[in-house]
């Protein structure tokens, strides 16, 4: 159903002959036919939800999730910078819950993008006795981020980190081929990995503060608590 030529992408990176590659591919896959399966529309949650899963565990696992932009959304670049600011060890929430208060044994900000929609948020691992306090602090910090925004230095450092990691990750032919393949499958051009840095470079402080206000909405947050009850 899904493994069809209409759904397949072949990406090749390296010192190769186009003529030889075409002849080889024609010989291997000639006659392989099948129907086209279009990308489906993802369902989204646009209202506040609180979910608790009672488990007998030593620690509780908390997630504060928000709707985010997809791969084809122009907001994705500013959100990627936002993610870089908040996910590092120097991030504001990490500082409050790990450095100033030893409340979280694990903490990270995440950003997962699908085709036309994404999800982002905060994961926190903590003691069950601290769940209420961690909830309060996390929500308070989110409100501060939305209200006060970030600094030029935070945005500059986050952009440099993203760009540096990108150039390092694209040093092998295998990585380039994989990027070309996935980008083509998502409806973007195979050379997207070359233009992505330009999009990141254009992100401004105002862009990052704007997407923080747009997406980090506590009234549309999905809160999940997996673990025991105090």
Annotate each language-model stretch with its function.
Residues 15:
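Carbohydrate-associated surface elements
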Residues 18-22:
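Extracytoplasmic/secreted cell-surface and envelope-processing proteins
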Residues 192-195:
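Surface-exposed aromatic
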Residues 1-6, 27, 31-73, 84-136, ...:
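Non-catalytic beta-strand/loop surface segments
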Residues 156-187:
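C-terminal hydrophobic structural anchor segments
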Residues 147:
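Short, Lys/Arg-rich flexible segments
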């Amino acid at each position: 159903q899904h493994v069809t030529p209409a759904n397949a992408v072949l990406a090749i990176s390296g010192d190769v002959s186009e003529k030889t590659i075409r002849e080889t591919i024609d010989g291997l896959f000639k006659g392989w036919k099948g129907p086209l399966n279009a990308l489906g529309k993802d369902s989204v949650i646009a209202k506040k939800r609180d979910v608790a899963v009672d488990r007998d565990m030593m620690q509780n696992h908390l997630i504060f999730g928000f709707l985010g932009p997809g791969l084809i959304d122009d907001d994705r670049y500013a959100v990627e910078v936002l993610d870089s600011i908040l996910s590092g060890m120097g991030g504001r929430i990490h500082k409050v819950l790990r450095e100033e208060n030893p409340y979280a044994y694990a903490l990270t900000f995440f950003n997962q993008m699908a085709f036309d929609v994404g999800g982002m948020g905060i994961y926190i691992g903590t003691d069950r006795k601290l769940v209420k306090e961690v909830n309060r602090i996390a929500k308070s910090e989110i409100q501060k981020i939305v209200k006060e925004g970030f600094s030029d230095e935070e945005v500059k450092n986050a952009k440099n980190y993203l760009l540096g990691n990108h150039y390092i990750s694209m040093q092998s032919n295998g990585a380039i081929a994989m990027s070309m393949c996935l980008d083509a499958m998502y409806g973007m051009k195979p050379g997207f990995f070359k233009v992505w840095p330009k999009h990141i470079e254009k992100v401004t402080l105002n862009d990052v503060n704007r997407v923080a206000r747009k997406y980090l909405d506590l009234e549309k947050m999905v809160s999940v608590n997996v673990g025991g009850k105090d």
